[in-house]
Amino acid sequence: MEILSLILYTVIFSFLLQFILRSFFRKRYPLPLPPGPKPWPIIGNLVHLGPKPHQSTAAMAQTYGPLMYLKMGFVDVVVAASASVAAQFLKTHDANFSSRPPNSGAEHMAYNYQDLVFAPYGPRWRMLRKICSVHLFSTKALDDFRHVRQDEVKTLTRALASAGQKPVKLGQLLNVCTTNALARVMLGKRVFADGSGDVDPQAAEFKSMVVEMMVVAGVFNIGDFIPQLNWLDIQGVAAKMKKLHARFDAFLTDILEEHKGKIFGEMKDLLSTLISLKNDDADNDGGKLTDTEIKALLLNLFVAGTDTSSSTVEWAIAELIRNPKILAQAQQEIDKVVGRDRLVGELDLAQLTYLEAIVKETFRLHPSTPLSLPRIASESCEINGYFIPKGSTLLLNVWAIARDPNAWADPLEFRPERFLPGGEKPKVDVRGNDFEVIPFGAGRRICAGMNLGIRMVQLMIATLIHAFNWDLVSGQLPEMLNMEEAYGLTLQRADPLVVHPRPRLEAQAYIG
């Protein structure tokens, strides 16, 4: 007990000493820092975040403006909450904000920064980005695997059509669909047997692992902001991360070892390509791939490429159930282009203008990543007359930017018409060029899988609109549907969407 007491007193004394020294020798900057709430001693503004940081920082922006400074423990943090401020960071000063700050999630779950998402900006990151751009996300690669996405969406449609009177947890089946579509491209096979969440018990387990990773990764870990407390793991976050990483690593190691030594035909999957690149110089500067980097890349693709798309589609269907006139108009458009004797195909999407507006409006109101992944200032800079110190962490409140009343009329309403000709934002896109809505980020660290994500989300939403009418479980009124958010790295629904799908096409459309 005496040793523990000595350790505790030493920690408290070191905190007080550091706080006094920091207060006494406060840095002098050539310009003022951005405004923000007054920090508490030691913990700073961590106390102001609450359980949903995207909402709390959006509320702060109403008081302090769209560029805020927060002191999170001993870490300088700046928050951008408007399109113009976001453009300053990710367009004008993009090169200065292209790396990630140290964080426990990258250390414990992303193979110690050896993945694409958290790797420092440099040769290794460029190598991983190039591999994804060429072999998975290029236009040719997306076109080559179009049939895979359509097959898995058709499997999803059959599963929903066969539900009968049984209520369906839509999010789980959507996750199975997106995971199998990505797995067939990456691994050459499905992860979940026949694509039915009811049949394969792995589906629920995998979904829970992905959601748990997103929730844990979205926690503001005190140890990241007060390094002296890191070893205590006060919130138990590091322990959860390590256990979750062990489960994912076992899953990915089995896949990798099973794949080695296989002989592939002309159409290789991504993993076989990655394995072959281990023996080549994948990039002039980047060097060769390692098994750890391959597993880290697979982890990125499985987590970021499945849960984000499925949660976006779940939000879209919830909004359409609450807005039956919008649903009916979308069905009318698709019926006119596709008919009722077959399912929507990817090549039909270019003709579906109203559907595209629905997808954009869903990305606006329900961005899968409400707070951007953090970036770090490599050097000090000036933004809008304020000083941004070197080493500051940058957070973009994507959720607040897309709900800014100065940029959007009736920002809380689901109104796809705003993106149509004659609407308020007919030319605004979601691909990182228009900062009013940036669900995939922008600049050098924009989401590598953006084009795949857009294609998959459009196809799934179009198919679900076209193939089914939607009823809530008995007693629920559409206007009373709970639209509360559950915060994590991705924006989940607080209550999973439980529905009765009612087929509306000719029977032959669901066969085959």
Curated annotation (Swiss-Prot):
Q: Which Gene3D superfamilies match?
A: Cytochrome P450
Listed GO MF terms: flavonoid 3'-monooxygenase activity; heme binding; iron ion binding
Membrane topology term reads:
Single-pass type III membrane protein
The UniProt entry, under SUPFAM superfamilies, shows:
Cytochrome P450 (SSF48264)
Binding annotation for heme: C447
Q: Which InterPro entries match?
A: Cyt_P450, Cyt_P450_CS, Cyt_P450_E_grp-I, Cyt_P450_sf
Where does it localize? Answer: Endoplasmic reticulum membrane
- Which stretches face the Cytoplasmic side? 22-512
Reaction(s) catalysed by this chain's protein: a 3'-unsubstituted flavone + reduced [NADPH--hemoprotein reductase] + O2 = a 3'-hydroxyflavone + oxidized [NADPH--hemoprotein reductase] + H2O + H(+)
What pathway annotation does it carry?
Secondary metabolite biosynthesis; flavonoid biosynthesis
Give the record's GO biological process terms. flavonoid biosynthetic process
Q: What else is known?
A: May act as a membrane anchor for localization of other, soluble, flavonoid enzymes to the endoplasmic reticulum.
Similarity comment: Belongs to the cytochrome P450 family.
Q: What's the protein called, per UniProt?
A: Flavonoid 3'-monooxygenase
The record's gene field reads CYP75B2
